[in-house]
């Protein structure tokens, strides 16, 4: 159980309609993300193991070779959020998919590896995004922000945290979902995996655009993904569909790999630049 209420990263950053939660414990953690998207986009494909030069990785696919959520054998996890509160520079044509960002970075073996790839990367012609990275060996959480012209970053403490966003209103999403989460942290099993699943399936305040499990006419939570990192194992669970139906259907797709030993790392840079 996590004793302290987590931090919130809502309207300060904006982003894709989603809820992202990280629950930290020493050099382990659990992490969950609701992917809220236009229904016409479809649920995508379940996680698979991907072999890179630097590391094994697990992630679901959006159907076009991209992803929004991934982890690797070193326990690093990345989550991508569209940054909708920042207006892209209209003089540029945005033709490159943000879904390609994580696959280009996820074989990084450390925070310094990932920094090196970022420094060599070119995000030109990509719409604004935020990338949240969790690094258990370093006990650090980082957030990179691309506004379509410049890349910035923010370092967070190693503590439990939520991110809320909505294309309708980041402020209202943070207010409504944040209130639900603050209440949930008083529950006896707060911080557990079962608690996290129930939280991300919540309709507290009635199903709608600002409930954690989103329901709108043309947009809803299309899938739920989770990562569990322990000293010896990396596990990703994934459910295609609204999280509110998980309890009835009980079809969470789960896949796991062994956690690599950081003491055996060679000096190397993780990925090729984007």
Regions found by a protein language model. Name each.
Residues 13-274:
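N-terminal nucleophile
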């Amino acid at each position: 159980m996590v004793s302290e209420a987590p931090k919130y990263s809502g309207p300060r950053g904006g982003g894709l309609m989603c809820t992202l939660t990280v629950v930290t414990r020493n050099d382990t953690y659990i992490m969950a993300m609701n992917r809220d998207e236009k229904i016409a986009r479809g649920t995508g494909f379940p996680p698979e193991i991907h072999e890179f030069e630097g590391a094994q990785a697990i992630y679901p696919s959006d159907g076009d070779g991209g992803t929004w959520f991934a982890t690797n054998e070193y326990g690093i996890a990345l989550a991508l959020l569209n940054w909708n509160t920042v207006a892209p520079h209209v003089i540029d044509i945005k033709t490159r998919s943000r879904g390609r960002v994580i696959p280009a970075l996820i074989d990084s073996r450390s925070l310094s590896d990932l920094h090196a790839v970022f420094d060599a990367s070119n995000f030109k012609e990509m719409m604004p995004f935020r990338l949240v990275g969790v690094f258990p060996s370093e006990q650090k959480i980082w957030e990179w922000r691309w506004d379509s012209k410049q890349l910035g970053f923010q370092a967070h403490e190693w503590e439990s945290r939520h991110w809320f966003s909505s294309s309708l209103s980041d402020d209202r999403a943070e207010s409504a979902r944040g209130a639900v989460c603050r209440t949930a942290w008083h529950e006896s099993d707060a911080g557990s995996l079962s608690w996290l699943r129930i939280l991300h399936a919540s309709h507290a305040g009635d199903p709608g655009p600002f409930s954690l499990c989103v329901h709108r006419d043309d947009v809803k939570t299309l899938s739920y993904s989770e990562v569990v990192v322990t000293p010896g194992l990396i596990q990703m669970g994934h459910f295609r569909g609204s999280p509110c139906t998980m309890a009835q259907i009980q079809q969470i797709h789960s896949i796991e790999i062994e956690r690599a030993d950081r003491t055996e790392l060679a000096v190397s840079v993780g990925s090729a630049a984007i």
